[in-house]
Amino acid sequence: DGYDAELCYLRDRTGKEVDFLVTLKGRPWMAVEVKVSETAVDPSLIYFRDRLKIPYVYQVVLEARRDMIDRGVRVVPAHAFLGALP
């Protein structure tokens, strides 16, 4: 069969944005913000997570050396995130 999923870009009127939003059956399921080297959690991820009740929130960082959770957001090296995809 497959999944009733969509991949979107998320931005509000004030300019807050998240690079990727995956929805399942029309509901927000996972948000992903991508950074080159910044491991401090992007405030937009927390804003949208709380506002839209997104269950899985990641900040994927190209140059990160370790995986950590900060305020409920998983900050993960890009190689680990991409390596976990099916």
Predicted regions and their residues:
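A cross-kingdom feature that marks ATP-driven nucleic-acid transaction machinery
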Residues: 1-86
